[in-house]
Amino acid sequence: MVEIHLKNSKSRKVELLQPIEPGRVSLYLCGPTVYDRAHLGNARSAVVFDQLFRLLRHVYGAENVTFVRNFTDVDDKINARALAEGREIADLTAETSQWYLDDTRALGVLDPNHMPRATEYIAEMVAFIEDLIAKGFAYARDGHALFRVRSFDDYGKLSGRSVDDMIAGARVEVAPYKEDPMDFVLWKPSSDDIPGWDSPWGRGRPGWHIECSAMAHALLGEQFDIHGGGADLMFPHHENEVAQSCAAGHGFANIWMHNEMLQVEGKKMSKSLGNFFTVRDLLDQGVPGEVIRFVMLSTHYGKPMDWTEKKRAEAEATLRKWYAALRQSVAEQEATPHLVDSLADDLNTALAITTLHGMYETGNFGPLAGGLRLLGLWSGTVPDWSEIAEVDLTYFAGRFSSARAEAMVTKDFTDVDALKSALTAAGVEVRMSKDGVELVPGPTFDPAKLEDL
């Protein structure tokens, strides 16, 4: 059997995956808080751990892998959005949960074995908290239940922090119901206008951290193999998960994996910079899901990823070539051992893609198909978008070249810009270089829009 090695955030070392139950693997991923569309950062986490899921299924067999990815459907952000839109919370979370599934499926993300919703596990959360209080790791005060951070000696080891440093260097909520500023909320009271459930501490709702611990315990048991999530969740979310779960006597996760963050054109993605994209934004712009996935897999999960227009164009061009090769009635073969070994080496998707390039260049299209399937980029049929429209753009290329040459002399690029805008609006990619102009029909190409030209 192939040996899989993964970077464990807890030990900061690449370790051999040794399943707790030989031959069977369990995986938990922190899923979305459902109140809006999934942005590209959310999508990276979904794609990365889907790729791990696919590798585990390939090595151990689909029936021997259990993957849990939750929906957080009780949260103050959800409450605020529902209030702002005048909607029922259940309607909002149902709609946005489906959005998430639709968008991630478009990226080739398989549905996990279990997709629990936090609201379905309130009883388990209450029981979990009661156990922590009984063991002295938590306490109740003023309708709240809180975890005593200093009672757990290993607090901070996952993220590499000490409690004293955290207090000195971070803004910590100071509240009268806390014994210590570092204590975190397990349960909090709810007013009449927001969701709440009966509990020994009064009507209220769970804190974010207890949700994942309770759902992981309910579906995977006291100890499981791998816990994943974005690097931004390591502290405080994952640190708090470790504390409350281990304090309860659960071994919790053996290996912790974290994917790094995503930026756009070299800058942090933010609405203020105007570079904030949701998955749906790109799909609606005609960017195929396979292209989005390819770009994400081109960077190792442990490194920051930069989404750029250049990478998108290169990914699309590469996939068009590969799909054209597979259109030739290729007999699909298993992914090669070399490609599987690349993925088994801390999920090195970038190396796996390099291996696929080599297969294409040497005409090994059968293994290419198998490799693309393992990477979630091939389902057995060539996607329609990859077929380049049969159209002669010679006239427009000549016209653009002439206008460009004249503009280089007159320094007036008005006609060039107008023609380029019209071509782009028609779904034509304009590629300019010192060798001339190349016009390439894109996935949204509409020849009707060229008629006025």
From Swiss-Prot:
Subcellular location field: Cytoplasm
Entry's EC annotation: 6.1.1.16
A Pfam family: tRNA-synt_1e
GO BP annotations, alphabetical order: cysteinyl-tRNA aminoacylation
Reactions catalysed, as given in the entry: tRNA(Cys) + L-cysteine + ATP = L-cysteinyl-tRNA(Cys) + AMP + diphosphate
Binding site for ATP: 271
Entry keywords, A to Z: Aminoacyl-tRNA synthetase, ATP-binding, Cytoplasm, Ligase, Metal-binding, Nucleotide-binding, Protein biosynthesis, Zinc
Details of cofactor binding: Binds 1 zinc ion per subunit.
Any one GO cellular component localisation term in the record: cytosol
Residues at which Zn(2+) binds: 30, 212, 237, 241
Lineage: superkingdom: Bacteria
GO MF entries: ATP binding; cysteine-tRNA ligase activity; zinc ion binding
Motif 'HIGH' region location, chain numbering: 32-42
Ranges spanned by the short sequence motif 'KMSKS' region, renumbered to the chain: 268-272
PANTHER family attached to this UniProt entry: CYSTEINE--TRNA LIGASE, CYTOPLASMIC, CYSTEINYL-TRNA SYNTHETASE
Record's subunit section: Monomer.
HAMAP family per UniProt: Cys_tRNA_synth
Annotated NCBIfam families: cysS
This protein's name: Cysteine--tRNA ligase
The organism of origin for this protein: Jannaschia sp. (strain CCS1)
